[in-house]
From Swiss-Prot:
Organism for this UniProt entry: Haemophilus influenzae (strain ATCC 51907 / DSM 11121 / KW20 / Rd)
GO biological process: carbohydrate derivative metabolic process; carbohydrate metabolic process
CBS domain residues: 227-284, 292-337
Name listed for the protein in its UniProt record: Probable arabinose 5-phosphate isomerase
E.C. code: 5.3.1.13
Protein task: Catalyzes the reversible aldol-ketol isomerization between D-ribulose 5-phosphate (Ru5P) and D-arabinose 5-phosphate (A5P).
Binding site for substrate: 92-93, 99, 105, 131-140, 165-167, 237, 290
Family annotation (PROSITE patterns): CBS, SIS
Family: Belongs to the SIS family. GutQ/KpsF subfamily.
């Protein structure tokens, strides 16, 4: 008896097993995926073309807000709302998610009258969402409706309306929030990016909210925190063979050419290759000053590591000499692309 693996599809209350061997011959999944992405990309284009002055008014409202941007939604709309909150909060717009059902049972106490409330409902008729409206009006909160139905209960009671209409969901049954979820997510990103630009939100600001992980290290860490202080140094008169020995022992692929505590140059793997190409066996008779790179690039020890890395990327170099206030060499920072 042959071995079959099965995929289960839910059809109402029934569970129907379908052999994956048969399934693979039935459909071209690539075509389905491409069609889905085509529909969704077109929906994003339509959203872009549909944006009007309401969008500008919402941005101005949020910029002037002295409270928080509170976002609420149910189901997929709620999940999208949580992602919006995460983006806003990390880019300079204080924000939190308010579950409409929980809000109706006590969490409304989290609100202040100066907060702005953004409610997401594609139909605009989600009962748990709309039940909040009288309380929000009573508190004095401004309401932003994110919906496809400008004549809905939510839209009619909101102060501002952002339209997320889509022609259809890519779900074959036109039921599961797919295209509409993407459009809502993209609208949230468009709002966040506009606010970032309006506030001139810089990497240093971003770093304050992302102190952990590689991102935080790059944005908050200073050069002096990561630089190597045990440096491979040679004199201008050091011969080629001894230079190679120092570079090998230093394990950095470079040697700093120093004289009287002053930086005269740097020798990298590239300098070694160029010297050998130009001089062949005669390179053995050369000294450091003959093939070093004079006036190497430097950076101050108190600069952010991100600046050092960006500089090395731009100059296409892998090592940068670190100096102090007196312009004395105190370290070396490396970058691996």
């Amino acid at each position: 008896m042959p071995n079959f693996s099965f995929v289960f599809f839910y059809d109402s209350a029934k569970i129907t097993p379908i052999s994956t061997a048969l399934l693979g011959r039935r459909m071209n999944y690539l075509k389905i995926a491409q069609d889905s992405l085509s529909v969704e990309s077109n929906a994003l284009l339509q959203l872009s073309q549909r944006l009007g002055d309401d969008f500008n008014q919402v941005i101005d409202l949020i910029l002037a807000c002295e409270g928080r941007l509170v976002i609420g939604g149910i189901g997929k709309s709620g999940l999208i709302g949580k992602k919006m909150v995460a983006t806003f909060a990390s880019t300079g717009t204080p924000s939190f998610f308010l579950h409409p059902t929980e809000a109706f049972h006590g969490d409304l106490g989290m609100l202040k009258p100066i907060d702005i409330v953004m409610l997401i409902s594609y139909s605009g008729e989600t009962d748990d969402v709309n039940k909040l409206i009288p309380s929000l009006k009573n508190f004095g909160n401004k309401i932003i409706a994110v919906t496809s139905n400008k004549n809905s209960t939510l839209a009619r009671h909101a102060d501002y309306v952002l339209d997320i209409t889509v022609e259809r969901e890519v779900c074959p049954n036109n039921l599961a929030p797919t295209t509409s979820a993407l459009v809502t997510l993209a609208l949230g990103d468009a709002l966040a990016v506009s606010l970032i630009t309006a506030r001139n939100f810089q990497p240093a600001d971003f770093a304050k909210f992302h102190p952990g992980g590689s991102l935080g290290r790059r944005l908050l860490c200073k050069v002096k925190d990561q630089m190597q202080t045990r440096l491979p140094t040679i004199l201008p008169t050091t011969n080629f063979t001894d230079c190679l020995t120092v570079m090998n022992e230093g394990r950095m692929g470079v040697a700093l050419v120093m004289e009287n505590e002053q930086l005269k140059g740097i020798i990298t793997d590239g300098d070694i290759r160029r010297a050998l190409t130009a001089n062949g066996a005669g390179t053995l008779n050369k000294t450091a000053k003959d093939f070093m790179t004079s006036s190497p690039k430097t950076i101050h020890q108190d600069e952010f590591l991100s600046k050092a890395e960006d500089f090395m990327k731009a100059k296409k170099i892998h090592s940068l000499v670190v100096v102090n206030d007196e312009n004395h060499v105190v370290g070396l920072v490396e970058f691996s692309s």
